[in-house]
Curated annotation (Swiss-Prot):
Coiled coil: none annotated. Keywords: Calcium, Cell projection, Cytoplasmic vesicle, Endosome, Golgi apparatus, Lysosome, Membrane, Metal-binding, Phosphoprotein, Repeat, Synapse, Transmembrane, Transmembrane helix, Ubl conjugation. Gene3D superfamilies: C2 domain. Belongs to the synaptotagmin family. GO terms for biological process: autophagy; calcium ion regulated lysosome exocytosis; calcium-dependent activation of synaptic vesicle fusion; establishment of vesicle localization; learning; memory; negative regulation of clathrin coat assembly; negative regulation of clathrin-dependent endocytosis. Ca(2+) binds at D249, S252, D255. It comes from Rattus norvegicus. It is a single-pass membrane protein. The second C2 domain/C2B is required for the inhibitory role in both clathrin-mediated and bulk endocytosis. The transmembrane domain and the first C2 domain/C2A are critical for the inhibitory role in clathrin-mediated endocytosis or bulk endocytosis, respectively. Unlike in other synaptotagmin family members, the first C2 domain/C2A does not bind Ca(2+) neither mediates Ca(2+)-dependent phospholipid binding. An aspartate-to-serine substitution in this domain inactivates Ca(2+)/phospho-lipid binding. The chain crosses the membrane at residues 16-36. This is Synaptotagmin-11.
Amino acid sequence: MAEITNIRPSFDVSPVAAGLIGASVLVVCVSVTVFVWTCCHQQAEKKHKTPPYKFIHMLKGISIYPETLSNKKKIIKVRRDKDGSHRESGRGNLLVNAESGLLSHDRDPRGPSPASCIDQLPIKRDYGEELRSPMTSLTPGESKPTSPSSPEEDVMLGSLTFSVDYNFPKKALVVTIQEAHGLPVMDGQTQGSDPYIKMTILPDKRHRVKTRVLRKTLDPVFDETFTFYGIPYSQLQDLVLHFLVLSFDRFSRDDVIGEVMVPLAGVDPSTGKVQLTRDIIKRNIQKCISRGELQVSLSYQPVAQRMTVVVLKARHLPKMDITGLSGNPYVKVNVYYGRKRIAKKKTHVKKCTLNPIFNESFIYDIPTDLLPDISIEFLVIDFDRTTKNEVVGRLILGAHSVTTSGAEHWREVCESPRKPVAKWHSLSEY
């Protein structure tokens, strides 16, 4: 019988190598498929994508850029035809200036029109405030309207109960803030208040404490004890306890309800704890005849049409509250065209000084023909982290300057181009 032989083809490639080749081919196919799908998807998006200029057009009149991007502010006119209508089918070319955050219009190559009015200037929505003139201030017979959060003088502000004791072994003054009664309503929505108390020992002002906030009550019971070490008993007669009663506000600065001043000259805690109750009175803001002085420097570049304003320093600023604490001043610079504010900037806060040195400069692009209608207002403000900031005084240079020195300073700046002109000015009441 013949022998049967099975003949099988032989492969030079091993099974492992064949598997690797197949995997590589699969990866390449998947990659090509993903790439083709991505390209097609991007093409479809481009066809349905809204041009970016339409988005900016939707936001016209709204500042979409932060003010801190640059210190430059541009003041540019709107181009109009003789008949008063805008060019290009009755509309001006609105542009958004990304550097300064101001709306502007294309410049006319022939130069700005001599006839200008306030509504022709690009004004940010938050720059729509008008310049307050000292000539239009309230007369002594008139009274400012009071807000719901600020109590009037004839409104009872309640009373505060506390106790004073002295720990002789530890040489420590012990003050317990117990409770308050009959506080006024500071929140019109909830018809209540969120009171707390800040206490300072005068005149050294080194010891400052505050209680916790009690929610929605006009008769808070604090019952908190504070111990002040290192105060000799012999010095108690020279100290004054200052209690500042406030109402917490989650969304803005806290409201000041009133204050209590207690000289320890008539208090003798040597025999034990002395409990006292005092009426809360309206906070006494010192009214000073002198508001201090401010030194500023101005320089105008007619070729670049650029005004450089430098806030140099201030001196002899008044203390703004009865506690006599050193102020935390800063300067707010407002630029007005006519009565409309078109730019605003402010310096950094200088802590615990009444003679601050700022040395901060701001640059504004102002066409030469607009200078007669430009005013620059400097507001010196006392910063308070807890309560509302107090305006120490103000200075106006330019078209609405009410002082001889201010008008003279502005005239020198306009008549001496490219030359910085620095002067001291007395601050007036705001």
